[in-house]
């Protein structure tokens, strides 16, 4: 027993040391752009202006032929954090996005309406800035975000990455970024996703020995007023944010944080992926998305119907709606209706939108299901680059 006790004490000491080395980035929760537009009665016009029918969506996304991000992924984003670039620091609000790998912020040279509505980066005001000069382009829906690549210090809650290459956008498409609560995006995906061959921020954190462990983790609070307690943690994970033990799931392709699904169950019936399919765990997507034909069946199964271009349910039926369970690595991850239905107040009336959305991701990248914030709110998520695996456990409210 004595050697076992010593081993246990050593493990506890290692855990305590790892806890002390955690770098926590607070995430603030804001009203999503979709809710803003819905409250202003402008959501239908937004669909029309972007040529989108959200009830029959098949927006193509193929990251292997070009760097392409579905624009609608950011329509429902609610969790944001702060970073700084340069010396002295210039602050920006960003989405920490595991579904992409580039860092970009608006440039002072940008003339798009979105840049006029957000802070912009001034390279001439940073003593540590280096011009790289390469061009980059990321496709968002039907428009491109384009710019040049520079290098500078990037700081995230006490972690300072030297010589980080990042995108300075000079053109941003559409109205989505105009009204967005965020200024830019910090990608946490694998290097193979990065436009312009840029080394992602977290890879540089590891290379510069800034993190104790080669992993980061995400906790998204369900608190609708500000998301109190939500955080991104670099260098490890915090056991106080989840119950039980982590289930470790191998990454099947090192681009997105892609894992295998064993099945998707609605109520007591496995409706999808009965022979297995692929999914990504993505902090840069608010909803849960899947192939449009499968999502249409899922909407019907939960009783959701099209209303003003999106799916919603009668708020009075939540008690009778089915659970939706994702079977992953022989473990069940169950969402009850209050988890996957998104309440809103529109002109004094309760609105209950569906947390599921159709999104066509064709081969070779797809088809894919995306487990976005609707899923991550319920399951604490650890992204382990050292072992190329994702850890999931029930989140503690």
UniProtKB/Swiss-Prot annotation:
Glycosylation sites: 91, 323
Disulfide bonds: 110-115, 273-277
EC number: 3.4.23.34
Record-linked Gene3D superfamilies: 6.10.140.60, Acid Proteases (2.40.70.10)
Catalytic activities: Similar to cathepsin D, but slightly broader specificity
Gene Ontology biological process: antigen processing and presentation of exogenous peptide antigen via MHC class II; proteolysis
Enzyme class, broadest EC rank: hydrolase
Keywords in alphabetical order: Aspartyl protease, Autocatalytic cleavage, Disulfide bond, Endosome, Glycoprotein, Hydrolase, Protease, Signal, Zymogen
GO molecular function: aspartic-type endopeptidase activity; identical protein binding
Domain of life per record: Eukaryota
Cellular compartments annotated: Endosome
Tissue-level expression: Expressed abundantly in the stomach, club cells and alveolar macrophages of the lung, brain microglia, spleen and activated B-lymphocytes. Not expressed in resting B-lymphocytes.
Keyword Transferase: no
GO annotation, cellular component aspect: endosome
PROSITE patterns the record matches: ASP_PROTEASE, PEPTIDASE_A1
Propeptide, residue positions: 21-59
Post-translational modification as stated in the protein's UniProt record: Glycosylated. The nature of the carbohydrate chain varies between cell types. In fibroblasts, the proenzyme contains a high mannose-type oligosaccharide, while the mature enzyme contains a complex-type oligosaccharide.
This protein's record includes keyword Methyltransferase: no
Span of the signal peptide: 1-20
Domain Peptidase A1 stretches: 79-393
UniProt record similarity statement: Belongs to the peptidase A1 family.
Assembly mode: Homodimer; disulfide-linked.
Function (record text): May have a role in immune function. Probably involved in the processing of antigenic peptides during MHC class II-mediated antigen presentation. May play a role in activation-induced lymphocyte depletion in the thymus, and in neuronal degeneration and glial cell activation in the brain.
The protein's name in its UniProt record: Cathepsin E
Organism: Mus musculus (Mouse)
